[in-house]
Structure formats: C-alpha cells, structure tokens
C-alpha cells in the first residue's frame, strides 16, 4: 500500500496546486513512483486525459510533474461553472449533467465521493506515493459538513497533511491558528506541519511565530517558500495577467463564461495582453474571442453590450480577429444550439465562413495539425480540443494530422479576411506559430521582428521544484511518511 501526502491551505490561492506540483517533481526526481490526486476540483480550465476525458489543468500539470500521462483518475470530479449558480458535473472525464449548487450538495455529492475514494484506494495500491491536493479552506463553517475535498479525504487516506498559507497576503499566522482551532482533534493529528508560501524578506523574522505554533500545536514549520517568478499555468486567476501595453495592442474579450484562458499565457509573456469588457475599449491590433462554457449566451452578451459591433468595426479598420473554440464558433455565420443554451439557431458574428451545430457528445482529444493560414502555411502545431460543437467551413484553418497519436486527415477551423478561428486550445504554446503571427502583425506596423519562447513547461516545473526543495524540509517529510 502506498503512502498519502496531502496539501491543504488556509484559503483559496494559498499555493496548493503549485506546491503539489513541486512535490510531485521532487519525489519523482528522487526515484519514487508518485501520482497526484484531487477528489473534486471546480475550474473553467480543463485539459484532455489519456482516456479521452477531461481533467482540471492543475492535475494535468501535476501529472506532467510526476512524469505520468494525465488520467481522469487524478481528478475524478470536475465542476465547470456555467453561470446562474449552476455547474456541469464531469465524473471520470465525462459530463454527467448540470446541477445547481444545492442540488449537487443534496443529491449527487455523496455518491460521487464514494466513487472518488474507490479511485484513490486503487491509486494507493498501484503507486508508492499519492500526493493529494485539497480545495479552498478545510474549515469553512458553512461548507465543512459538505466538504469532500479536504479532511474527509485526509481521514480516508490517513494522509500526512501539510497546511500551507500565503504569507504575501498578510495574516498568515492568524490564518493557521484559526484553521487549527476549527479542526477536530482527529484532524489536527493528521497535520504534519506548516508551510509559509510566497514570502518576501528575511525569514528569520518569522521565528517567534514558528516557536508559537510548535509550542501550541506540537507541529513544526516545514518551510518558507519565497515568491517564485514563473511561467506556469495559473488555474483560475485572470488577475495573474494584469493589463500590459506591449508594442502590439492585443485584446482578449473577457466573456462572462470565459474558459481555458491559460491559452493566452504565451501572448502575455511575449507582448502583454489586455482583457476587455466594454465596446468602447475594442481597438486592438489583435482581438481574440476566447473559449466559453456557454457560447451562445456569451455571444448574445457581446451583442447586447455592443461588443460584437465594435469588433466588426475594428476588423473593418484593420484589426486582426481570432477565435479559439467557442470564440471560433461565435465568429461564424450561425450556431445551432439545442444542447448548451437550447436557443436553437442563432446568428453568428459573420467574420468567418463557418457554421456550427452543437451535439451532446463532447470531443476531448490531443491533436497535431498542419496550418493552412498563409503566413504559417505547412507549419506543424499541437494542442487539444474540448468541445461539443461540430463546425464546417470551405476554408479551414488547419488540417488535423493526428488525433491522440493516431493518423488522421480532418479539416479544422476556418479562415477569413484578416480572421481565423480554431478549436486548437494551446495553439499559442507553439512558440514558432506565435512568433510568426506576432511578427506578421509587427511588420504591418513597421516594427522589428521578435523571438518568442526560450522556455518550456518542463523547464519551468523543474526550476520551480528546485526552489521549493531548497526551502522545504523534504527529509522530514520522507521520514514521517515512513519512506526513509
């Protein structure tokens, strides 16, 4: 039977996901067979699994850190918010329905929790270490009785549990004390120690606080992890990408149901991006409509708020317009949706020669494609699709050459005049393509070409993990897990 190590936080945003990722890589580097696990995650940013299902981006990244192929078993329950206090429930990679928060808590949660724990038990039999991520805070008084992502999981797995806090926000010692006081005695006994995350300054100044915690709870501080600059995907925070005015003005429409906004991280690093929500803001050299959890509702939101007309006007005046997944569907001539919004036929923006019909079956695949857009013609790219729509166009953007490693020949996306749309999430992580697109636009403005890239997710994981390892008592953790 394998060992369970869990990371819980005093709040959302404490750094649980990246700390788990770092621990996954640290233990993998030490030669252990390690996998990640999160019983339930709520996220609009998902990724394809090896089984053809979808999991959260956080567990996908953690699997990469473990040097494992991402599996739905690492994130059995995924909740994807749809708006109006409803979420799509994805279990073991497949959608099983849409429910309100109350319906979910009262009807589905216990059944799914039992099934998720069966998956966890299997992982612990198959692997040496399972590193489990909690969610939010484990002691939210109004939610604790319904919580299936924190201490119920720790108790089930008898997991040694690290409690992490974001010291950069302030109040971290009070957050730890408050959390510990609200845990039961049984739950406090599972706490291995504390980690202070995102620290800036002289850690020796924190010593009196460490001594207080050890005296009061008999638990050590396991580490003080500094703020680490990185280019790793941030799971659900657009605030990680503040407005940056580069030499190109790149605008991304911040849709009410925006999803998979991690697509645009390379643009942020290469130039800077600006998320816009008002018609009067639309004027970029490059305007992008991103993916959406509710495509038709977001299209109608843009229409009602004048953003659609502003995009059309900007396009007429020379802006280049791109749509990714739901954004691609919106840019077409029409959408027939009797699945997601059930609004039937809806007129599209009309900048692309494409028509979309929604179907109940979701496509979730890794893809390799050949670009047909002239400035990058014949360039090979890879990414993934997570979609319920089927689109047709006489002018495809690319030809899919591989689907989950199997050879294919399938037209994808659409091309228009200074416009393209694609289902390829992650296309901008193909740095050669992004460089070609940005330099195409830069040349039009008389700007010198730039180089894009110089980093990779693998390198960023390794660099991040090394910093964490240097500032964490890994030896103590190994000893307490009985692995020494």
From Swiss-Prot:
InterPro entries associated with the record: Class_I_gatase-like, CobQ/CobB/MinD/ParA_Nub-bd_dom, CobQ_GATase1, CobQ_N, CobQ_synth, GATase_3, P-loop_NTPase
A biological process from GO: cobalamin biosynthetic process
The keyword Phosphoprotein belongs to this UniProt entry's keyword annotation: no
UniProt-annotated catalytic positions: 325, 425
Pathway as given in its UniProt record: Cofactor biosynthesis; adenosylcobalamin biosynthesis
Gene Ontology terms, MF aspect: ABC-type vitamin B12 transporter activity; catalytic activity
PROSITE patterns: GATASE_COBBQ (PS51274)
Keywords: Cobalamin biosynthesis, Glutamine amidotransferase
Domain GATase cobBQ-type: from-to ranges: 247-433
Family indicated by similarity: Belongs to the CobB/CobQ family. CobQ subfamily.
Role summary: Catalyzes amidations at positions B, D, E, and G on adenosylcobyrinic A,C-diamide. NH(2) groups are provided by glutamine, and one molecule of ATP is hydrogenolyzed for each amidation.
Protein name, entry field: Probable cobyric acid synthase
Name of the gene this protein is made from: cobQ
């Amino acid at each position: 039977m394998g060992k369970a190590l869990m990371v819980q936080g005093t709040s959302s945003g404490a750094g649980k996901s990246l700390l788990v990722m770092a621990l996954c890589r640290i233990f993998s580097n030490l030669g252990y067979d390690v996998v990640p696990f999160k019983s339930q995650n709520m996220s609009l940013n998902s990724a394809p699994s090896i089984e053809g299902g979808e999991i959260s981006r956080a567990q996908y990244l953690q699997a990469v850190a473990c040097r494992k192929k991402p599996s739905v078993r690492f994130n059995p329950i995924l909740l994807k918010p749809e708006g109006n206090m409803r979420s799509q429930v994805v279990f073991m990679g497949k959608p099983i329905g849409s429910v309100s928060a109350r319906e979910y808590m009262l009807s589905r949660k216990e059944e799914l929790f039992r099934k998720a724990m069966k998956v966890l038990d299997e992982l612990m039999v198959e692997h040496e270490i399972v590193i489990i991520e909690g969610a939010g805070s484990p002691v939210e008084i109004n939610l604790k009785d319904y919580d299936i992502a924190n201490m119920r999981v720790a108790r089930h797995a008898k997991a040694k549990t690290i409690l992490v806090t974001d010291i950069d926000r302030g109040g971290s010692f009070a957050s730890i004390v408050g959390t510990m006081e609200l845990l039961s005695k049984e739950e406090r006994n599972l706490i291995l120690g504390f980690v202070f995350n995102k620290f800036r300054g002289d850690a020796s100044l924190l010593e009196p606080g460490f001594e207080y915690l050890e005296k009061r709870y008999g638990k050590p501080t396991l580490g003080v992890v500094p703020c680490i600059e990185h280019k790793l995907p941030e799971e659900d925070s657009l605030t990680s990408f503040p407005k940056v005015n580069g030499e190109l003005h790149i605008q991304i429409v911040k849709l009410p149901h925006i999803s998979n906004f991690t697509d645009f991280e390379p643009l942020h690093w290469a130039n800077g991006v600006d998320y816009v929500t008002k018609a009067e803001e639309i004027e970029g050299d490059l305007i992008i409509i991103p993916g959406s959890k509710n495509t038709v509702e977001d299209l109608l939101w843009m229409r009602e708020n004048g953003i659609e007309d502003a995009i059309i006007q900007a396009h007429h005046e020379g802006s280049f317009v791109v749509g990714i997944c739901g954004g691609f569907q919106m840019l077409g001539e029409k959408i027939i949706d009797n699945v997601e919004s059930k609004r039937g036929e809806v007129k599209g923006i009309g900048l692309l020669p494409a028509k979309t019909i929604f179907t109940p079956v979701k496509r979730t695949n890794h893809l390799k494609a050949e670009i047909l857009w002239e400035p990058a013609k014949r360039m090979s790219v890879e990414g993934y699709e997570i979609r319920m729509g089927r689109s047709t166009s006489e002018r495809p953007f690319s030809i899919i050459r591989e689907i989950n490693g199997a050879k294919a020949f399938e037209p994808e996306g659409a091309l228009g005049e200074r416009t393209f749309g694609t289902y390829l999430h992650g296309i901008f992580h193909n740095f050669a393509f992004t460089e070609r697109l940005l330099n195409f636009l830069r040349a039009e403005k008389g700007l010198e070409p730039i180089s894009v890239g110089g980093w990779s997710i693998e390198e960023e994981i390794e660099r991040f993990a090394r910093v964490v390892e240097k500032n964490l008592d890994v030896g103590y953790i190994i000893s307490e897990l009985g692995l020494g």
